[in-house]
Every structure is written in C-alpha cells, then in structure tokens.
Amino acid sequence: HEVIVVNDGSDDKTLATLIAGFNMVKAKRQQIAALQTTEIFGTYKSQTHPNLWVIDKGNGRKADAANAGIGFARTPLVCVIDADSIIETDGLLRAAEPFMLDDGKMVAVGGAIRIANGCEIRGGSLRKVRLSKNWLPRFQVVEYLRAFLTARVANAHSNTLLLISGAFGVFRRSTLVEMGGYRHDTVGEDLELIVRMHRHMRDKKEAYKIDFVPEIVCWTEAPAEWGGLKNQRARWQQGALETLIEHWRMIGNPRYGRIGLFAMPQVVIEDILGPPAELLGYLVVPVAILLGLL
C-alpha cells in the first residue's frame, strides 16, 4: 500500500513539518490520471518510509485535493480520508474485503464514523474511548450512532446507499477516474459523488454494488461550538440541495431502480422538506395548545 498526503496550498508549516518529520526529498512521480486540480508544485518521497508521498499543490479545497491524490495513486483501490480522522487498526483490511469477495462488482465501501471528542488519542492512535464533557458532541454521538448503525445498514441492505462519508471511504480507482473524480462546484462533494456513481453505473448498464460495513470504524472530531455546528449543517443542507438540483432527472425515475424510486425521493422528503416542516411544527404546536386545539 501507499500513503499519499496532499498539502492543499497550506500557508502554515505543514509541508516543512512533513519534510522534516519524515525525511522527505523532492522526487518525480508520474500522474496516472489527469483529473481536474489546481497546479501541482511538486512531489516528495520519504527516505525512511518509501511508501509515503506528499503532493504539494495550490489551494483548491477538499474535492480538488482528493482528485490530486487519486490522480497520483497507482493501486486499484484508493482510500480517501480527512487529515483529522483516525482509522482503527483493522479498518483498511475490513474495507478491502468486500472488493475481494464481490467479483469486481464492488465500486465503493464506507464505514461507521464515530465522535473522537473526549477520547484519549496518542501518537495518531485512539487509546481510550471517552465521552466529551461538552454536551454538544454528546448529542452528536447519539445522532451518529443512529445514522451509521441503523439508517446506513438498512440502505446498504436494500442497495439504496446514497452517501459514503467524506471523512472515510474506499473506492475502486478505475471507476473514480471514469467519472472524472470529485466535482468542484458543490460543497457536498461526498453525497454528489455517490449519487453520480449510481447514475454512472446504471447509465452504463453494469452490475455494481456500493456497500457499508459497520465494523469499519473511523474516528473524527465533531463541532464543539454552536457556530461550527451551524456552519457544518448549513453546508450539508446546501450540498444536498445542489446534488438534487444537479441530478433531478433521477428523482422518481424508474430507469434508476430503487435509487430513483425510493432513495432520491427520501432525500427530498427528509433533507429538503423535513427541516422547514419541523420548524413549522415548533411554531404551530404551541399556538395550537394556546388556542385549545390540542
């Protein structure tokens, strides 16, 4: 395996720290797939860890950085992971297993995302699981458990999985390259990628599978302040809207099977109509109680 770290135009000492910490030298590396990215300034190889590379490039945000890594990757499978996420020790092996057992049909695998706030982390490894003392991450622990241990499992079982978290996902590289990688014109690149992957494979009329394995656990930091949580949820909502607008022809379309008839309408109801309906409920119920209607 290889580890490719993408320095996405950072203006701090990230690149210098990587070069010094891992004894890296500038080395030429051929880009296998020319996906859309900002300018590549250089590639570096570790002299102490020959399978560790760093790509230095101009700032282009998450999707652009992921495309750079995919373009330089040489392995048939690629794992896209956020810099602040930690995979449990057997995570990659568990993620690779479905690809080996599915006769080439598997194109993407996701895992459970857990909240790392409050946990003991040393040397890049999670040593002890603890709850955060802050109530905001605690509420998100319950939310994430519901999402990843019930909803995603059910979606995967019915072949209607529309989202593999941007924090951690394993993909067949050839499929990503065929699709042109991640798109730059959406803030919900993880959702858009999987929806487009369904569309791409069904338009090609090829048998495929996108799976979720709950035993794969990736730990990540959740927003601990209301401002950060608000920005995160606004970004998720915007990403869902952008994806639905881009792929609106899939909604209710029998050509896309369960994805078009069930999964896409579910996103419309839950993510688009749900929030305003819930807000309306908060306003209507107290008024109805005051008027004696409830």
What are these regions (language model features)?
Residues 11, 85-86, 113:
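Acidic metal-phosphate-binding loop of nucleotide-sugar-dependent transferases
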Residues 175-178, 186-212:
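A short, conserved alpha-helix in the catalytic core of glycosyltransferases
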